[in-house]
């Protein structure tokens, strides 16, 4: 009982009223926007960067010390001076600063506690490529997988309640509601796609944080329930009192499962279950039977609806057999393939031939999706035939070659872990020929003329970077094997998916 209570209990020291006061500190805005450091991909906003200065920050803090500029009325929001077009910069600055501040208690909890004891947490590499070695190691031994689209829309108030689990700072929560009021109607709903489109240039850090904290909240409880199948069988719901209304929801879940399955949660016992998530998509893979996966499916549906008040339809969760279906995940088509092999065994004067089959985890480049992305960006037509890029025709020859080369190297870098390199060579072919057509269009010549003029140097522009990296992995004297190396290489320095590879 105490063990379960300790898992869900929040440390009171992290619930002090300290977040709101930080919004009045000048250094917060410098840290929030990486002023003087390399900016992150979530904070790229050229227009805002030009307007940033400590003088503007001082004026902003002065205004906040004065009369209530943060009061927002639903009836006169258009007349509010603080939200006017001239004052919109202040609102954006506060929201970016607040996004940085609200991350502080979450970051500190992952590093250490006030008593100096380290919090046990699984260490994971930052690279998104680190997921694939895990899949190769685990999924090849499993049978079924739940292909899950994380439910949305999410009501704004649910996002605020998620933060309430971690901090009791009422002032900060009111400020959070202020920003949610500002950008959307309170009765509206936010979806994952709307996050990307609506907040692509403004306050992306804040709303990504809200969504990720919401997902992290249900993941923490989901993983806890998965790891405690036998404890939950006889545990009184009061053990979950520390989470707001969680104990009531647990009682409801117990009744639901008792009614439908005549058991509680112990039928989820499975030591070979694994969970992986990226953005709005997740997978639950198991070595069990299809019946077990059906139980997990309807458990998740009830879990989201009863605890998070999020409507989730069963059709958003697909049960697939790994040997018969491919997973569309992080711009790869992944599947488990049976790889037959013949082994000859010699024992004294007799020899035996044994047919052996090993499951291997394949990762393929999705040709159809890639052709669609290339056609959308005008590198090829809808049939996959390379075409010129007219919008780049006004650039210098070196800039054109450099742009195509960087895209080619970036995609080659990302898809280096593909099981079959043929699709990767197709990508290079499209970019190389599109580059040649763009140069020919600029100089009003033919493609053949430019290919003859550029020759091998043009090829090196697209392959040199890959060979340079492979030279660090393969022996120095195996130049041929470096150039035509067909093995899988997962680079652990990739933090985001290239736009052309991201089809989700």
Swiss-Prot record:
One of its GO terms (biological process) is mRNA processing. Usually encoded in the trnK tRNA gene intron. Probably assists in splicing its own and other chloroplast group II introns. It is found in: Plastid, Chloroplast. Pfam families: Intron_maturas2, MatK_N. This is Maturase K. Keywords: Chloroplast, mRNA processing, Plastid, RNA-binding, tRNA processing. The keyword Membrane does not apply. It comes from the Eukaryota. Belongs to the intron maturase 2 family. MatK subfamily. The lineage of its organism: Eukaryota, Viridiplantae, Streptophyta, Embryophyta, Tracheophyta. GO terms for cellular component: chloroplast. One of its GO terms (molecular function) is RNA binding.
């Amino acid at each position: 009982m105490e063990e379960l209570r300790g898992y869900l209990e929040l440390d009171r020291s992290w619930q002090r009223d300290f977040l709101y006061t930080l919004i009045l500190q000048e250094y917060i805005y410098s840290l929030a926007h990486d002023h003087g450091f390399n900016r992150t991909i979530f904070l790229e906003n050229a227009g805002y960067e030009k307007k940033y200065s400590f003088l503007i920050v001082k004026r902003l803090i002065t205004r906040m010390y004065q009369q209530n500029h943060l009061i927002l009325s639903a009836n006169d929001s258009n007349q509010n001076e603080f939200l006017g077009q001239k004052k919109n910069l202040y609102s954006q600055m506060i929201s970016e600063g607040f996004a940085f501040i609200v991350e502080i208690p979450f970051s500190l909890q992952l590093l250490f506690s006030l008593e100096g004891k380290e919090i046990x947490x699984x260490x994971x590499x930052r690279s998104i490529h680190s997921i694939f070695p895990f899949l190769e190691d685990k999924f090849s031994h499993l049978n079924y997988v739940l292909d899950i689209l994380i439910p949305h829309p999410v009501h704004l108030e649910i996002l605020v309640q998620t933060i309430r689990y971690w901090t009791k700072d009422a002032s900060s929560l009111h400020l959070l509601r202020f920003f949610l009021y500002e950008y959307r109607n309170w009765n509206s709903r936010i979806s994952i796609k709307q996050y990307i489109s609506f907040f692509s240039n403004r306050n992306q850090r804040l709303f990504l944080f809200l969504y990720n904290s919401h997902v992290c909240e249900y993941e923490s409880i989901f993983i806890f329930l998965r790891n405690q199948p036998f404890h939950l069988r006889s545990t009184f719901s009061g053990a979950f009192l520390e989470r707001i209304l969680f104990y009531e929801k647990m009682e409801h879940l117990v009744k639901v499962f008792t009614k439908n399955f005549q058991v509680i949660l112990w039928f989820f016992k499975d030591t070979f279950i694994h969970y992986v998530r990226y953005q709005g998509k997740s997978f639950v893979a198991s070595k069990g039977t299809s019946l077990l996966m059906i139980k997990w499916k309807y458990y998740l549906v009830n879990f989201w609806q009863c605890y998070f008040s999020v409507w989730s339809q069963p059709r958003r969760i697909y049960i697939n057999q790994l040997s018969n279906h491919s997973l569309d995940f992080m711009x790869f088509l992944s599947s488990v393939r049976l790889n037959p092999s013949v082994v000859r065994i010699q024992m004294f004067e007799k020899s035996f031939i044994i047919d052996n089959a090993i499951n291997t985890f394949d990762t393929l480049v999705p040709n159809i999706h890639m052709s669609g992305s290339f056609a959308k960006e005008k590198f090829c037509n809808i049939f996959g035939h390379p075409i010129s890029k007219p919008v780049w025709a006004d650039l210098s020859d070196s800039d054109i070659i450099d742009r195509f080369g960087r895209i080619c190297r970036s995609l080659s870098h990302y898809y280096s872990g593909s099981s079959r390199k043929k699709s990767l060579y197709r990508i290079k072919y499209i970019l190389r020929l599109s580059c040649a057509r763009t140069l020919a269009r600029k100089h009003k010549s033919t493609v053949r003329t430019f290919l003859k003029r550029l020759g091998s140097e043009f090829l090196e522009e697209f392959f040199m970077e890959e060979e340079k990296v492979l030279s660090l992995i393969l022996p120095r004297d195996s130049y041929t094997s470096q150039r035509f190396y067909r093995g899988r290489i997962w680079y652990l320095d990739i933090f985001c998916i290239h736009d052309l590879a991201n089809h989700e």
